[in-house]
From Swiss-Prot:
Subcellular location field: Endoplasmic reticulum membrane; Cytoplasm; Nucleus; Cytoplasm, Cytoskeleton, Microtubule organizing center, Centrosome
Physiological role: Substrate adapter of E3 ligase complexes mediating ufmylation, the covalent attachment of the ubiquitin-like modifier UFM1 to substrate proteins, and which is involved in various processes, such as ribosome recycling and reticulophagy (also called ER-phagy). As part of the UREL complex, plays a key role in ribosome recycling by promoting mono-ufmylation of RPL26/uL24 subunit of the 60S ribosome.
Known outcome of mutating residue 294 to A: Abolished interaction with ATG8 family proteins
Record annotation: effect of changing residue 359 to A: Abolished interaction with UFL1
Name of protein: CDK5 regulatory subunit-associated protein 3
Species annotation: Homo sapiens
Residue span of motif Shuffled ATG8-binding motif 1: 267-270
InterPro entries: CDK5RAP3
Region annotation Required for interaction with UFL1 and mediates interaction with CHEK1: where it falls in the sequence: 269-506
Domains as described in the record: The shuffled ATG8-binding motifs mediate interaction with both ATG8 family protein and UFM1. The RPL10a-binding domain (RBD) anchors the UREL complex onto the ribosome via association with RPL10a/ul1.
Residue ranges of the motif Shuffled ATG8-binding motif 3: 310-313
A Pfam short name: CDK5RAP3
């Protein structure tokens, strides 16, 4: 019997309510009685004496049977004056709480209510709070990862921006203005390249000319005409190259529309609506221009259908070039349009200049390879009758000439000059380059803003976690108290046998 007295009673928490009902400790219809008790408690707490402990019991916690017992004990002190000679209280407060306790003790309703609270806390409330805290921690890790990604992405885009600016030869402080300034400096850069070619290509051209004349037996045939011309006269005008005479007047094309467009586009009204405003501006200008043309020249369309002077395109320079190409009828000695450009500015002559440079480079590189190999009998006998300029060449001289040519080709084909040539040909290219570079900078700024947003969200998740953790600790504490009260109450019903509520994981 004594051994049986110490055998513990293990009850699975999830089945605690069924266990109490099956063993007739509680009524099957306990929920309706609990609703009646809750209504009476809500009515009773409206009229309570001033007491700090009572205020703590009534603030923010679910009032159950044991709270009611403590409230009744406190009321015995505050309502002592209402006690009659029979030991009963005439105070309505005491009567209300005594009735509540009596209803609780009927069919052990208090025990099943406490068990219901325990099951709800264990199965729902505590897991829900833990899940919310875990979600906050997960969000903090995710926001921290995104913060690092945004920081790295912003730095990468900013680095790409400055790297691209370096390729264009600008600092990036004022992209449009710096590009236009480079275009203004383009003639001086090309003049330097022309001067370098004029000083360094003489011997290389003579070697190539002598080799062609000796091998092909046609000494009168002139090779590399463009290089010869630049070597003699430098980066002169297309007019001088075409006619052989220096022009008396040079009327260079004026790109006046370019600064005006820059000044107009420099007005930034924000990140939205820019395209619509610019399109409306273009349409207004075109319509106005059309109205002016029709008013001044009412018969232009009928008299000259082929010479349409109205340019409906987006590129003002295209109109100017079209007119200048008809400048072959300019007075003698006057260079206009493409004729007024230098050889390295005009696309056709610049391409010819590059082609001849590459032709000369390939020849000299091959000749350097031939001179580096051991001379055979055929080679020696072949060049015995060659001109002195060919016999006096060495591998070192060939390599030096090749390096000079490579330097000239590298300067003309550099990315910076290629962009400047495109800007010179089309002012709209400035807009595209500016937009391309500014887009990288905007992406960097957006990523930086996103990083700040991730920091803010991470802080919000941290604050939410800090607010949930005390709630969880308090709920765990209350649930442990409920567990102890239930175990003690059931133990009394079984002669003090130990009771263990299993599956709480508190």
């Amino acid at each position: 019997m004594e051994d049986h007295q110490h055998v513990p009673i293990d009850i699975q928490t999830s089945k605690l309510l069924d266990w109490l009902v099956d063993r007739r400790h509680c009524s099957l219809k306990w929920q309706s009685l609990v609703l009646t008790i809750r209504e009476k408690i809500n009515a009773a707490i409206q009229d309570m004496p001033e007491s700090e402990e009572i205020a703590q019991l009534l603030s923010g916690s679910y009032i159950h049977y044991f709270h009611c017992l403590r409230i009744l004990d406190l009321l015995k002190g505050t309502e002592a004056s209402t006690k009659n000679i029979f030991g009963r209280y005439s105070s309505q407060r005491m009567k209300d709480w005594q009735e509540i306790i009596a209803l609780y003790e009927k069919d052990n309703t208090y025990l099943v209510e406490l068990s219901s609270l325990l099951v709800r806390n264990v199965n729902y409330e505590i897991p829900s709070l833990k899940k919310q805290i875990a979600k906050c921690q997960q969000l903090q890790q995710e926001y921290s990862r995104k913060e690092e990604e945004c920081q790295a992405g912003a730095a990468e885009m900013r680095e790409q921006f400055y790297h691209s600016c370096k390729q264009y030869g600008i600092t990036g402080e004022n992209v449009r203005g710096e590009l236009l300034a480079l275009v203004k400096d383009l003639p001086s850069q090309l003049a330097e390249i022309g001067a370098a070619a004029q000083q360094s290509l003489g011997e290389a051209i003579d070697v190539y000319q002598a080799s062609v004349g000796f091998v092909c037996e046609s000494p009168t045939e002139q090779v590399l005409p463009m290089l010869r011309f630049v070597q003699k006269r430098g980066n002169s005008t297309v007019y001088e190259w075409r006619t052989g005479t220096e022009p008396s007047v040079v009327e260079r094309p004026h790109l006046e529309e370019l600064p005006e467009q820059v000044a107009e586009d420099a007005i930034d009204w924000g990140d939205f609506g820019v395209e619509a405003v610019s399109e409306g501006t273009d349409s207004g200008i075109s319509a106005e221009a059309a109205g002016i043309d029709w008013g001044i020249f009412p018969e232009s369309d009928s008299k000259d259908p082929g010479g349409d002077g109205i340019d409906w395109g987006d590129d003002a320079v295209a109109l100017q070039i079209t007119v200048l190409e008809a400048g072959t009828q300019a007075p003698e000695g006057v260079a206009r349009g493409p004729d007024a450009l230098t050889l390295l500015e005009y696309t056709e002559t610049r391409n010819q200049f590059l082609d001849e440079l590459m032709e000369l480079e390939i020849f000299l590189a091959q000749r350097a390879v031939e001179l580096s190999e051991e001379a055979d009998v055929l080679s020696v006998s072949q060049f015995q009758l060659a001109p002195a300029i060919l016999q006096g060449q060495t591998k070192e001289k060939m390599v030096t000439m090749v390096s000079v040519l490579e330097d000239l080709i590298g300067k003309l084909t550099s990315l910076q000059l290629q962009h400047l040539f495109m800007i010179l040909a089309s002012p709209r290219y400035v807009d595209r380059v500016t937009e391309f570079l500014q887009q990288k900078l905007k992406q960097s700024q957006l990523l930086a803003l996103k990083k700040e947003l991730m920091v803010q969200k991470q802080q919000e998740a941290l604050e939410e976690q800090a607010a949930l953790e005390p709630k969880l600790d308090l709920l765990l504490e209350k649930t442990k108290e409920l567990q102890k009260l239930i175990e003690a109450d059931i133990s009394k019903r079984y002669s003090g046998r130990p009771v263990n509520l299993m599956g709480t994981s508190l």
